Regions:
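Small-residue-biased structural context
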Residues: 1-237
């Protein structure tokens, strides 16, 4: 179903009760719990947020099939970069340490000398290195570059600049997504020996929630920001 699930007049508290995975997403916009009965629109007005942008982010997060490229291309580059920067910060500050903590307990509580555990540990380390390297590159090089192009072209949202042809690119698999999928797969298929099932679930649950978040981040990154930048580059030449 390609329809959005959340609309401006809905009570945000009801949406969050049904989809608690949205809590970190609304936190990135400065909206904290204690939502009362306020609608999405009212909360956006109170926080001086663009309701359209918040709703698009929420809906693309909840429904992988829903991805309104044309609409996303009308937002300003700075809005998109601000959101991607905040998701990066969330990975560094919360999600990576969270997986690491669960993984540490899980490994220490399992049978010593279990070969799968070493493999899981190594996979997580390479995933963490890749993700941190990408975030550093984003902060130092990629995002500032996107913003400088956007400033050159003035204050117009990219989608409205005359002559800006945005074509969505087909992309090869993202290494970060692939490493996470492998990590999950190793745990599901190859765990052996004696281990704590509850801790195992905690590790898998934290991996899955990061995976969902990164998939949305990547859709915005590759299908919106990258094509916007290519289009802006052509105009700046």
């Amino acid at each position: 179903d390609k329809m959005p699930l959340v609309y401006p007049n809905m009570q945000l508290s009801e949406v969050v009760e049904e989809h608690p995975s949205l809590i970190p997403v609304i936190n990135r916009f400065g909206i904290r719990l204690g939502l009362g009965d306020k609608s999405v629109k009212t909360l956006c007005e109170e926080h001086s947020l663009d309701t359209d942008f918040l709703l698009t982010v929420i809906n693309t997060f909840l429904n992988e099939e829903y991805f309104p490229e044309k609409k996303l291309q009308t937002f300003h580059t700075s809005q998109i970069i601000d959101y991607l920067t905040k998701t990066n910060q969330y990975y560094l500050r919360y999600q990576l340490p969270n997986i690491e903590r669960h993984l540490g307990s899980f490994i220490s509580m399992s049978t010593p000398g279990n070969p799968t555990l070493g493999l899981i540990g190594r996979f997580f380390s390479s995933f963490k290195e890749e993700l941190i390297a990408r975030i550093e590159k984003d902060d130092k090089i990629w995002f500032p570059y996107c913003m400088s192009l956007s400033k050159k072209l003035g204050k117009e949202p990219a989608g409205t600049i005359d002559g800006l042809q945005i074509t969505s690119e087909q992309r090869t698999e993202d290494t970060i997504e692939a490493l996470l999928a492998d990590l999950k797969s190793i745990m599901v298929k190859h765990l052996s020996g004696d281990y704590d099932e509850n801790l195992c679930y905690a590790v898998l649950f934290s991996i899955c929630s990061l995976e969902k978040d990164i998939k949305q981040h990547n859709r915005i990154r590759y299908r919106i920001l990258t094509p916007m930048v290519s289009a802006m580059e052509k105009l700046c030449i």
